[in-house]
Amino acid sequence: MSKHKLEYIWLDGYKPSQSLRGKTMVVEDFSGKLEDVKQWSFDGSSTEQATGDDSDCLLQPVHVIPDPDRFGGNGWLVMCEVLNPDGTPHESNGRALIDDDDDDFWFGFEQEYTLIDTETNLPLGFPKNGYPDPQGPFYTSVGARVTKGRDLVDEHLHLCLEAGLNVEGINAEVMMG
């Protein structure tokens, strides 16, 4: 029997912008069901969610999906809320404010990102010297002259869909990268 790796993912307490955090629990057997994911703890003093003298915070799993990219089929992504040691929602846990019984509102988000060329430290496709062309031709563009990194974008989309994440679509933005 192979082991399963559950990657617990949560938002830290940094302001004004929270960042993703993660740690991996290894288990002998896992059904893939949320009710079989254990609550876990972490040191909140390193994530701006607790003080050093009282640093325990809890990770409450709220969603689990297969991780199609890692661990040969035995990987799972576990989305978590952060709780205080007494089980109440942590102040950084904005999701706790959502009323689960309220299905009258919908939201969506657009995940924008810029790919950086590690050799130049500039957005992918930017010239090494000078400035890029004006932004007009890049938005929703196709073709090698105006689009860079499409293979990575396509792979990202594929992995999200394989994991069961709802993605509405992709498009190039107003600049290279």
Regions from the PLM with identified roles:
Residues 1-177:
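Glycine-rich, acidic/polar active-site loops that bind/position phosphate-bearing ligands
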